[in-house]
UniProtKB/Swiss-Prot annotation:
Species this chain originates from: Homo sapiens
Identification of the protein by name: Olfactory receptor 51G1
Gene3D superfamilies cross-referenced by the UniProt entry: Rhodopsin 7-helix transmembrane proteins
Glycan attachment points: 6
Organismal lineage: Eukaryota, Metazoa, Chordata, Craniata, Vertebrata
Gene assigned in the entry: OR51G1
Bridged cysteine pairs (disulfide): 99-191
An example Gene Ontology CC term for this record: plasma membrane
Amino acid sequence: MTILLNSSLQRATFFLTGFQGLEGLHGWISIPFCFIYLTVILGNLTILHVICTDATLHGPMYYFLGMLAVTDLGLCLSTLPTVLGIFWFDTREIGIPACFTQLFFIHTLSSMESSVLLSMSIDRYVAVCNPLHDSTVLTPACIVKMGLSSVLRSALLILPLPFLLKRFQYCHSHVLAHAYCLHLEIMKLACSSIIVNHIYGLFVVACTVGVDSLLIFLSYALILRTVLSIASHQERLRALNTCVSHICAVLLFYIPMIGLSLVHRFGEHLPRVVHLFMSYVYLLVPPLMNPIIYSIKTKQIRQRIIKKFQFIKSLRCFWKD
């Protein structure tokens, strides 16, 4: 494939890649990806519908769960067009403005997910350590402020990245290593020094994932201290059980992120398919698994979903009769 390197940034393009060497199998590879995307969309929309339509679920925990579902939906939809475009139509070319826009949304939504998980850990801390004042501490106004601060912090920290990349001339190959645009991949293609991008990228990671993970760890240390002070064994288990879903969501988000970071920095000798696999796990597994985990582990959500399906089933039986 011949790549035309345009001197004008506005006319320049990047080329995305799927699974190199397996282009003939892209149609088959797209099947599990379609299933994952459909499951993510339906699962998170179901969570949002249940929370929005049931007044008994209008509490702090469920508001934060709704924020997580919105973030997961956004993260899924930000990669869907280019990933399926490559698998179905072999559409590899992407303009720099479109690439930078996708980059902005992917990194902003990833940062927002970290922030929402921190907000959920604060909710768990208040629920376990100060249960009598849960609704008075985390008021609707407070929850709205926490949500807005998550959006603003993420957007403002990520906003400089496209502008830092825009100043470069790209004299290396314009072929990106993934089916979507990421800051780390694009800056490697620049002709000049990328030290500023490296430093600012580390600063963003420290301010988002670094701070959030530290505060989440601290909140669970305080939760564990409170739980261990409870005399009743059953009450201790009940208190811990309320945190299981959130702990799973935290692990699903941070473990793939750490794994992807390690692979990028120290895994140059690894097969390229490992890099691709880790990147897809990082972006697709948390949005896929979060609604499933919360549907299974959260009794109120599980009961409402079952009722919805029973209602739909009864309607179908009614119309058949």
